[in-house]
Swiss-Prot record:
This is Synapse-associated protein 1. SUPFAM superfamilies: BSD domain-like. Keywords: Cell membrane, Cell projection, Cytoplasm, Differentiation, Golgi apparatus, Membrane, Phosphoprotein, Postsynaptic cell membrane, Synapse. Residues 172-224 form the BSD domain. Residues 52-62 have a biased composition (Low complexity). It comes from Mus musculus. GO terms for biological process: cell differentiation; cellular response to epidermal growth factor stimulus; cellular response to insulin stimulus; cellular response to insulin-like growth factor stimulus; cellular response to platelet-derived growth factor stimulus; positive regulation of fat cell differentiation; positive regulation of protein serine/threonine kinase activity; TORC2 signaling. The modification Phosphoserine is found at residues 283, 298, 327.
Length: 365
């Protein structure tokens, strides 16, 4: 059976099979040769095929066998060529992947796949978001009360690396979101060259990226809070000055109208009482908070100084007027005394004349 199949595919039949197929005739021939004498005498009988001959397939056509052999060779060659090409392709792909992995070019391979396209779109989306955030971000000193001063103080932070290495004090609540402040950090790297150099020197050798920016923005928040407090104190001081100036303007006409009508002695007593009141008012009062006392002192110091100077000037003027009035009274009294002296002298002269005339009259008589 297998011999017929191999002969149909164009392969040579095995020699053992051929020998087995040839054995029966030789045996029959031997038998016939051994029994040659009886066969001559008896009539010829048909030779019956043996079991092996019955099982042996019939002989095939040589042309058909040649075609089958050519077809088998063609299929074998085609399969061999295809297998060789597939093997070479797989080997080449494996070598390319190995080489790309060694050279770090695995991204080039991934870019050619669906995963590479997805990564490209994701990267593009992230870049667009970062661009929008960076365009909207501005330096911390923008829209501040005193931009120039705050800018100089913030830029001065980059000169000392301790501002980046020291963490905020324990217990201080400072909420820092690195993703939210990342665009501002990019803007600051563009604005401050010294900051970029400091970041290159410290990150990640001495401090992590997130800790570096947290400490930096904590110092910036302190600078901005200090500027806000200074501006608030200046506004309070200006409003206090305006209120006091308006109150002073309202009180000036009354004092000017009353002052000339008062006598000098009463003015001195009033001045003393006013000075006592000013001393009492300028004495530090008890306040609930130290900040309240500090604000009142800082706001009223200049006004109190001006008022004291005005009071001293008024006192000097009043003393001068009192002295002038005293001098005029003294002059009047002196003039009166001189007039009385002249009257007495004239009366004495008149008396002497009368005496002389009386003596003359007595002598003549």
């Amino acid at each position: 059976m297998f011999g017929g199949l191999s002969s149909w595919l164009g392969l040579k039949p095995p020699e053992g099979a051929a020998a087995e197929g040839e054995e029966p005739p030789s045996r029959d021939g031997d038998k016939l040769s051994a029994g040659a004498a009886p066969s001559e005498e008896s009539p010829e009988r048909p030779v019956e095929p043996t079991e092996e001959q019955q099982q042996q397939p019939p002989t095939e056509d040589p042309q058909f066998l040649h075609q089958a052999k050519g077809l088998g060779n063609y299929l074998y060659n085609f399969a061999s060529a295809a297998t060789k090409k597939i093997t070479e392709s797989v080997t080449e792909t494996a070598q390319t992947i190995k080489k790309s992995v060694e050279e770090g070019k695995i991204d080039d391979i991934l870019d050619k796949t669906i995963l590479g396209d997805f990564q490209k779109e994701q990267k593009k989306f992230v870049e667009e978001q970062n661009t929008k955030k960076s365009e909207a971000a501005v330096p911390p000193w923008v829209e501040s009360h005193d931009e120039e001063t705050i800018q100089q103080q913030i830029l001065a932070l980059s000169a000392d690396k301790r501002n980046f290495l020291r963490d905020p004090p324990a217990g201080v609540q400072f909420n820092f979101d690195f993703d939210q402040m990342y665009p501002v950090a990019l803007v600051m790297l563009q604005e401050d060259e010294l900051l970029s150099k400091m970041r290159f020197a410290l990150v990640p050798k001495l401090v992590k990226e997130e800790v570096f920016w947290r400490n930096y923005f904590y110092r910036i928040s302190l600078i901005k809070q200090s500027a806000q407090l200074t501006a608030l104190a200046a506004q309070q001081q200006a409003s206090g000055k305006e209120e006091k100036s308006s109150n002073r303007d309202d009180n000036l006409p009354l004092t000017e109208a009353v002052r000339p009508k008062t006598p000098p002695v009463v003015i001195k007593s009033q001045l003393k009482s006013q000075e006592d009141e000013e001393e009492i008012s300028t004495s530090p009062g008890v306040s609930e908070f130290v900040s309240d006392a500090f604000d009142t002192c800082s706001l009223n110091q200049e006004d109190l100084r001006k008022e004291m100077e005005q009071l001293v000037l008024d006192k000097k003027q009043e003393e001068a007027t009192a002295l002038e009035e005293d001098s005029t009274d003294w002059e009047k009294e002196l003039q009166q005394e001189l007039q009385e002296y002249e009257v007495v002298a004239e009366s004495e002269k008149r008396d002497e004349n009368w005496d002389k005339e009386i003596e003359k009259m007595l002598q003549e008589s």
